[in-house]
């Protein structure tokens, strides 16, 4: 299956880790969005929104990292690994995935993306959004090992990608003890962590270069 990506992209790293956990080989196709390669007609035909990551599995095209992750587990996963069949457990996983997209990662984007354009982060209010999001995550993890219950799921992998992005961006979340505990464990038990970290280093290099250029 073809996988269009950039190594540093948070969503791209999520899919890579999920594929690794499932034992799937991705035919990785580097797409340089900085050069506008996502706007080429052949790619827009696959994904009208021209975003990454995008997966093409035997002619079926799907994008948005969390949708890709769930698709891969539903099609190729075994038993209840990464995505239990129980409706209540799955509902909690879905809630955590939506939380990651709409609250946790969104708070990162609001505060850190301006660094790419101006060399300065977002406002104090934007920083408070990050603190609020981590407070929620810390509460979710109270008394449990994983973000959506007692086993590793796609929600852990997606949120691991996001939290590790905060780490390399030098956001200190050590005061959130449950998050710190979970993060230390998740790094050890999640397949593909090493490749996630390699992608983060690529992201950090780009991040640092943009900050310097914006000064």
From Swiss-Prot:
Question: What is the role of this chain?
Answer: Conjugation of reduced glutathione to a wide number of exogenous and endogenous hydrophobic electrophiles. May be involved in detoxification.
One family from Pfam that matches here is GST_C
Q: Which reaction does it catalyse?
A: RX + glutathione = an S-substituted glutathione + a halide anion + H(+)
| Lineage of the organism | Eukaryota, Metazoa, Ecdysozoa, Arthropoda, Hexapoda
What is this enzyme's EC?
2.5.1.18
Q: Name one GO molecular function term.
A: glutathione peroxidase activity
Question: Which Gene3D superfamilies did the record assign?
Answer: 1.20.1050.10, Glutaredoxin
Indicate the quaternary assembly.
Homodimer.
Q: Which organism is it from?
A: Drosophila melanogaster (Fruit fly)
Q: Which residues form a coiled coil?
A: none
Q: Which residues form the GST N-terminal domain?
A: 1-80
Q: What class of enzyme is it?
A: transferase
Q: Could you identify this protein by its name?
A: Glutathione S-transferase D2
Q: Where is the signal peptide?
A: none
Q: What family does the entry list?
A: Belongs to the GST superfamily. Delta family.
Keyword annotations from UniProtKB, A to Z: Detoxification, Transferase
Q: Which residues hold glutathione?
A: 50-52, 64-66
């Amino acid at each position: 299956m073809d996988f269009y990506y950039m190594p540093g992209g948070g969503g791209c790293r999520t899919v890579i880790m999920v594929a690794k956990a499932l034992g799937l080989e991705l035919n990785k196709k580097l797409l340089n969005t900085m050069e506008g390669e996502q706007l080429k007609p052949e790619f827009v035909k696959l994904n009208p929104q021209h975003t990454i990551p995008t997966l093409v599995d035997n002619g079926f095209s799907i994008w948005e990292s969390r949708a890709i992750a769930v698709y891969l587990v539903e099609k190729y996963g075994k038993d209840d690994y990464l995505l239990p069949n129980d409706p209540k457990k799955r509902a909690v996983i879905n809630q955590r995935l939506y939380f990651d997209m709409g609250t946790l990662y969104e708070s990162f984007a609001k505060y850190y993306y301006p660094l790419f354009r101006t060399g300065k982060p977002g406002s104090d209010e934007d920083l408070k959004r990050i603190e609020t999001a981590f407070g929620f995550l810390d509460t979710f993890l109270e008394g449990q090992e994983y973000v959506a219950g007692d086993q590793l799921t796609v929600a852990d992998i997606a949120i691991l990608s996001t939290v590790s992005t905060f780490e390399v961006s030098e956001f200190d979340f050590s005061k959130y003890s449950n998050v710190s505990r979970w993060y230390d464990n998740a790094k050890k038990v999640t397949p593909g962590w090493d490749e996630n970290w390699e992608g983060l280093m690529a992201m950090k290099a780009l991040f640092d270069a943009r900050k310097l250029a914006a000064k």
